[in-house]
Amino acid sequence: MRKGYVSPSLMCVDLMNVQSDIEKLEKVGVDYFHVDMMDNHFVPNITLSTDFIKALKKIKTPLDIHMMIEHPEQTIPELTCCDENDIICIHYESTLHPQKVLASIRAMGVKAGIAINPATPVCVLEDILPDVDMVLCMTVNPGFAG
């Protein structure tokens, strides 16, 4: 059985105190930092960018990047700062070719994850499971804290 992990979300972090907040969380020993990327197309909100992710790579704690964006294959090349300790998670519903996108993530040497929206049946993941390191089953429609 796989172990669970603690991955606090940075979506609601106070950007004026982000360094201090991250340092406090690192002291208590979190496993990952969850970074929500939103594009105002796949979901009706905009949050943290690839530039923010690049800045976060200065910390020791790995990143759990949740891409809530249309056509993630267009943004993934901007995440070459990620490494084998990080996870990049795409939404099944965000691309016509999820397995191809997952393969491109793994080709970068990064762990790959797949997320599904609440209305998406879990059975769509059957053929994808061998290609992922993580599955995220949303319990709320993506786009906002919840």
What are the roles of these predicted feature ranges?
Residues 2-6, 29-31, 59-63, 84-86, ...:
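Short, well-ordered coil/turn segments that N-cap beta-strands
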Residues 3-9, 33-38, 115, 134-141:
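Short beta-strands and strand-loop turn motifs
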Residues 4-17, 44, 62-70, 91, ...:
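Active-site mouth loops of central-metabolism enzymes
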Residues 15, 19-23, 50-54, 76, ...:
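Generic structural signal for well-ordered alpha-helices
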Residues 18, 25, 33-36, 79, ...:
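Conserved, mostly hydrophobic/aromatic
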Residues 33-48, 90, 140-146:
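Glycine-rich, proline-tolerant flexible connector loops at the mouths of alpha/beta enzymes
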Residues 46-67, 104-113:
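Alpha-helix-loop-beta-strand connector modules within alpha/beta enzyme cores
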Residues 74-77, 82-146:
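Conserved anion-binding
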